[in-house]
A protein has these predicted regions:
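N-terminal Rossmann NAD(P)H-binding glycine-rich loop of SDR-like oxidoreductase domains
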Residues: 10, 14, 18
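The beta1-alpha1 cofactor-binding region of Rossmann-like NAD(H)/NADP(H)-dependent oxidoreductases
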Residues: 50-61, 89-90
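Substrate-binding pocket helix/loop in short-chain dehydrogenase/reductase
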Residues: 83-84, 91-93
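Active-site helix of classical SDR
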Residues: 107, 143-146
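A short, exposed helix-loop element centered on a Lys and neighboring polar residues
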Residues: 107-108, 152
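Residue(s) in the substrate-gating loop at a strand-loop-helix junction
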Residues: 127
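SDR active-site lid
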Residues: 160-230
Length: 248
């Protein structure tokens, strides 16, 4: 029976992905900064483990508690919405610590066991902002685009060890806590000069018919984790699929 470790499982895409892998008979290690047992079914095949991907000691402890794993899903991430001109560099660094360096740190930590076994899959969850540039998310886009390039390079680097590396690219999920938290972080990041432009962007998002559901992402992660071909990109959600089509 295979084991998957998924970061960022307290809500949204990570939570649904943990539920889906469990429903498919896998052992699941669901990690979150503040563990909450009641969001997932009670099962001998499911463990909730505390993990902050920005803390090296946390990563080491979580992997020791998890034991050997077959798949790592780097899902944990934070959003940031606002004009770049008004974004403090400290806030930009905070986004990169989780979205970029946290993914790299988790991946680096599991590679020794994958390489030794000559088996394993890393699935990095990025965003459809890497498929088409969007305004007011410059820092967030940069943090995810870095992982896009990192994943592509690493896929070639680890091929000789039979370790696969994949990208899942979700679209806009308006109902996720991730999106709600991004909105909370906007305070002070839309200067008056940007307000009319920002309002048009927010209105367009609110009227978007094609969006991404949590189940879209869970299924895409499942496909990526079980894919034995050389496919790298797995867009998730109707909007992401539409954006990816011109690039396919």
């Amino acid at each position: 029976m295979k084991t998957v470790l998924i970061t960022g499982c307290s809500s949204g895409y990570g939570l649904e992905t943990a539920r889906y892998f469990h429903s498919q008979g896998w052992n699941v290690v669901a990690t979150m900064r503040t563990p909450s047992e009641d969001v997932l079914p009670r099962s001998e095949r499911l463990r909730v483990v505390a993990l902050d991907v920005t803390q090296p000691d946390n990563i080491a402890a979580a992997l020791e508690a998890s034991g050997p794993i077959d798949v790592l899903v780097n899902n944990a991430g934070i959003g940031l919405l606002g004009a770049f001109e008004a974004t403090p560099m400290a806030m930009a660094r905070e986004v990169f610590e989780t979205n970029t360096f946290g993914v790299m740190a988790m991946t680096q930590a599991v590679l020794p066991q994958f390489r030794a076994r000559r088996s394993g899959v890393v699935v990095n969850v990025t965003s459809s902002v890497t498929l088409a540039p969007m305004p007011l998310v410059a820092v967030y886009t940069a943090s995810k685009t870095a992982i896009q390039g990192f994943t592509g390079s690493l896929a070639h680097e680890l091929e000789a060890f039979n370790v696969r590396v994949k990208l899942v690219e979700p679209g806009y999920g308006p109902n996720t806590r991730f999106t709600q938290n991004s909105g909370k972080r906007i305070e002070g990041l839309i200067p008056e000069a940007y307000a009319p432009f920002a309002q048009r962007i927010f209105t367009a998002f609110a009227q978007s018919a094609a969006v991404t559901k949590e189940s879209d992402v869970a299924h895409a992660v499942w496909r990526a984790a079980n894919d034995s071909s050389g496919q790298l990109h797995f867009p998730a959600g109707a909007d992401a699929m539409a954006l990816a089509r011109p690039n396919s």
